From Swiss-Prot:
Provenance organism: Methanosphaera stadtmanae (strain ATCC 43021 / DSM 3091 / JCM 11832 / MCB-3)
Protein name per its UniProtKB record: Protein translation factor SUI1 homolog
Molecular functions (GO terms): mRNA binding; translation initiation factor activity
A Pfam family reported for this protein in Swiss-Prot or TrEMBL: SUI1
Gene Ontology biological-process entries: formation of translation preinitiation complex; regulation of translation; translation reinitiation
Keywords carried by this UniProt record: Protein biosynthesis, Translation regulation
Family listed: Belongs to the SUI1 family.
Length: 101
């Protein structure tokens, strides 16, 4: 049985990740990359509290696009701002703290 390093409870009973999701201020915006392609950037997620690789994998499958996680931010190919907000809100992030630019 794994023990949470933050609260000391077993991983099954740990609520640290849920609390971290509600508190974080997430920014979602698009930028133009090479050849005029759009990339959706998701930043402001603390890597220590939330598994950013697993979150990237979930967002890529829900948005049906390619992407990666680099330097503490998630990059998705295409314009997926609204879909990302819906998915993050469904995963427990507070929709008030998700800022779309």
């Amino acid at each position: 049985m794994k023990i949470c390093e933050i609260c000391g409870l077993p991983k099954d009973l740990c609520v640290c990740e849920e609390i971290a999701r509600e508190v974080q201020k997430v920014k979602v915006y698009t930028v133009r990359r090479r050849f005029g392609k759009l990339m959706t950037i998701v930043e402001g997620i603390d890597e220590h509290d939330i598994d950013i690789r697993e979150l990237t994998k979930t967002l890529k499958s829900k948005c049906a696009c390619g992407g990666t996680s680099k330097k503490g931010q998630i990059e998705l190919q295409g314009d997926h701002k609204r879909k990302v907000k819906e998915v993050l809100a469904g995963m427990g992030f507070s929709s008030d703290t998700i800022e779309i630019k």
